[in-house]
Amino acid sequence: ATPFYVAVITLVLPIIVVQLLYSNPYKLTGSSSGLVGFPSFFLSVQEWFWIAGGVLIFFSSAAWLFVNSNFGRVLIAIRENEDRCRYLGINTIKIKTWLFIASAAIAAVAGYCYAGFTVVVAPEIAGFVFGTELVIYNALGGRGTLIGPVIGAVLIDLSSAYLSGNLPYVWKLIIGSIFVAVILFIPQGVAPLIMQGVRFIKAGVFAKAPQKNLLEDLPELILAEYTNKNIQDIPLRVESLSRNYGSLRVLTEINLEIRRNEIVSIVGPNGAGKTTLMRCISNGYEPTEGAVWVNGVKAGKVSPHQLAELGIGRSFQNTSLFAQLSVADCLRLARHRAEAPSMFLHQRDLNLPESTLKILKATELDKMLNEKVSNLSHGLKRALELAMVLATEPSVLLLDEPTAGLTKSERTLIASILTDLLDFNDLCILLIEHDLDFVRDISSRIVVLHQGKLLLDGTVDEVVNSELVRSIYSGEQITLEEENA
């Protein structure tokens, strides 16, 4: 479903449900007038406030433990880069659905307490206006934080109560102006600003204290047992695959087989359909026609996380990571399917396959596990993405321009890593690359795409010495006879 579709359904569905409740013949809900005077608890106002405070502290503490656990890092990753999560094999829709249900349950507890306090249940209490107020609380306090919505709710409620009594004609204008000012000048909200101030003060107070050596506090790297043992002789087979965008045909009848322990490079001019082919292999909803077989299983119309479960791992043309997470958190995220993350504990040790450990040691990322991803160089980000994909233990590794933007020494290192992978892992590698020297050095076979068609599939020597390939890269017109040659 598109974001627009979800937004419309989210807005319209509650309206329909409310109208159905209004029209029920038994008047169980009191229709549009609501319910009043029903039996409640005999508690004083002060006791109700104590209950409200206790419930707030309980759920806030539980949320803090949850967000700071290993599973909480998954939620942060989904918020930051949902597509990358899906291609790592994480069922983001399932996680968001359960999170939505849990949030609704907490809201139900709050509604139960509020109804018991006021002895009134009416539709307008939790209507569209109240929903808008919740969004304002979140935006003002700081989205992506736990304390932010609490701060926003307290500030707005207290200021509204004070201003409505002293400035009854302009208080809404003042509150609205403050909200607009915060959105314009402090878009992250008040809570992050307060936390930055606290960190600044702490940095000044403890400036003379001995600094902790980050190398002494690194998570322990443990060799994980290799679990992907169901790799077929032909892990990847593409049959008559085509992709249309409206009336434009981008891929036409692509047939391709890749055997185990083989590196196959896809080359071709810009616009040949190379990245589109990658998308069609790694996302079952992309192809218009044809089929993709992974380890003998026909993929069909399935999502990227289901294809990852079958054994497909993919890196992107533009490095796709989680800028706000640490290197260790990213690697732990990649092991989501192999090791279910704890919901209330933050386990530091990392169980990683040998291929991932080799990359970390070769690039010295094993000494930077606590470093934020946003602080890494482009070359290290490329290496980290490859390490994450290998941590999922794929049998088919898809690499889209893995050497883009790298120095010569970094390209040499990547070439060495990829060739070593075939010696230690039963997998096949399909990569897109424009660096023909790199392709020549590591490839078992080369596939040539041109205008969405597979023109040539042969050994390195056959492709390098092909007059057809020279014609393509020189920009000469290719005839139908040459295409079918």
Descriptions of predicted regions:
Residues 1-213:
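Transmembrane alpha-helices and adjacent helix-loop boundaries
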Residues 282:
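Helix-to-loop junction immediately C-terminal to a conserved catalytic motif
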Residues 290-298, 310:
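Conserved ABC transporter NBD signature motif
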Residues 397-401:
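Catalytic Walker B motif of ABC-type/P-loop ATPase nucleotide-binding domains
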